Amino acid sequence: MSPFAGSTEKWWESLRVLVTGGAGFIGSSASRAFLSAGHEVAILEDFSRPGSGANLDWINEIGTPTVYEGSIVDSAFVNSCMAGFKPEAVYHLAAQVAVTLSVQNPRHDFETNALGTFNLLEATRTHVPSAHFVFSSTNKVYGDLARYPILATNSRYSFQEPRQGIQEDTPLDFHSPYGCSKGAADTYVTDYSRIYGLRTTVLRQSCIYGTRQFGIEDQGWIAWFVIAALLGRPVKVFGDGRQVRDALHIEDLIRLYDLVLSSSASKKTRVFNVGG
């Protein structure tokens, strides 16, 4: 089966696709899928997360991407990659992804998420202004959503108005250093479209899980619950356990990534909430 099963339109034969964080959990699945579809893929990766080397080996089973090893915080490095590869699409997935770690080291969180995104936007604007810039954002940009009344049942919390939902035009309300850094990046991506005419898509994702997610207690909770259960380790649940999260399998997210490119993009910037 094609990694992009379900796509209704394919308007290109082959694209040069740059994936930042391309050997991470989401990035490795995206990189492998793009290679399977016949695209030319470059991975920008610092290999700081455990498992990223094994993920690259998994990608190499399908094809051989160009690998740029370095940090998105390094502006000169980012510009060199962008100028050398000349991508037609940029999937920006590299990030510091844990709320807890953002509290422990807010500078690292800011530099990775906010400054790193800024560097990529500037490099795109300078070297490949026609490229499609796709940004992996987060539902954390909406804050705690305390403005919406909720009901507590015996097993879960739910909106008082069942059809309420969270729309893309919900006011942003950054909480935690992680929420602030990702929110700043999210805002920069949309504004670079308005000001400089870049073609951008922002995907505000929730809880993604699936193959090759090397979860830890601070991040990747579904994988961590499975790992902890297998190893007989205790699982910490904060609050009263009635919290509700949207969970989406990685294969479904990758199908969405394809649809973002293959669908009509008449607007310069698009923002989508990605639930489960």
Regions found by a protein language model. Name each.
Residues M1-I208, E251-I254:
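N-terminal Rossmann-like NAD(P)+-binding domain of SDR-like oxidoreductases, especially those catalyzing
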Residues F47, G241-V244:
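Short donor-sugar binding/catalytic loops of nucleotide-sugar-dependent glycosyltransferases
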Residues T170, F272-G276:
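Short, intrinsically disordered, charge-balanced linker/junction segments flanking boundaries
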Residues S52, S102, F214-D218, D246:
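Alpha-helix N-cap/helix-start motif
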Residues G183, Y196, I208-W224, L231-R233, ...:
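Glycine/proline-rich active-site loop of Rossmann-fold NAD(P)-dependent oxidoreductases
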